[in-house]
Regions:
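N-terminal, intrinsically disordered, polar/charged segments of Gram-positive cell-envelope systems
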Residues: 2-61
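Aromatic- and acidic-residue-enriched segments that line the glycan-binding/catalytic groove
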Residues: 107-117, 149-171, 212-220
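Aromatic-lined substrate-binding rim segments of carbohydrate-active enzymes
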Residues: 102-144, 220
């Protein structure tokens, strides 16, 4: 299951997200609904430029999505199952891991830093997955975990959160994190995101855009 709600999302369509089983089993409903309702910022009686000119405002897509892990979409049998599910229900999108909180990109990335440090695993073929989903009208949202990264923070300890003693800080699960104050960590994430867009992902969802909040004594 999804470990926590998404921290940031590039776009905010009206979205209903039903979480899937991260072990690759059939999806389970979590009844988590996220509806975009941004404030207009207008004072009472004011009208928007579209209303004044008569231009129609573009409607945001209504997305009803399930979350699928990289391992799940790496299975042809499971892809077929979820395509059939989308074709026979109101589901019209899937959230698929680009980089999970295990720190690995789920496919062979061409991003130089990923190649240099080997921070990827062959969980699935993104081109095959995207081709099959898009052929069935399925919108694909790529989930990209940002600072909870126990792999790149070990490969690049200079970019990791440090303890007061100068070593690598670890959360209560013994995992190291990237330091949000280090600009190189932003660039690393953006490069992976740009590659995913070029591959054909329709949207990027950034997760864990923060320090760890579950452990006490962050800098101990």
């Amino acid at each position: 299951t999804v470990t926590e709600q998404t921290e940031q999302q590039v776009t905010q369509p009206e979205t209903t997200v039903e979480t899937g089983d991260t072990t690759g089993n059939d999806a389970t409903t979590n009844n988590t609904e996220q509806t975009a309702d941004p404030a207009s910022g207008l004072n009472p009686g004011e009208t928007t430029q579209q209303e004044q000119t008569g231009e129609e405002k573009a409607e945001l897509p209504k997305v009803k999505a399930l979350y699928l892990t990289g391992w799940t979409v790496g299975s042809a049998e499971k892809r077929k199952h979820y395509i059939e599910l989308a074709n026979t229900t109101e589901i019209n999108a899937y959230v698929v891991d680009i980089k999970d909180d295990d720190g690995y990109v789920g496919y062979e990335s061409q991003v130089p830093e990923v190649k240099e440090h080997g921070t990827w695993k062959k969980k699935y073929d993104p081109k095959k997955m995207l081709e099959e989903f898009h052929a069935n009208g399925i919108y694909v949202i790529g989930r990209l975990v940002v600072f909870k990264d126990p792999v790149y923070s070990q490969k690049r300890p200079d970019l990791a959160v440090k303890s007061k003693k100068g070593g690598l800080w670890k959360d209560r699960n013994g995992l190291t994190w990237l330091n949000p104050y280090q600009k190189e960590t932003w660039e690393y994430t953006v490069k992976i995101a740009k590659e995913a867009v070029e591959l054909g992902f329709d949207e990027i969802q950034f997760d864990y855009v923060r320090f760890d909040s579950d452990s006490k004594g962050l800098m101990d």
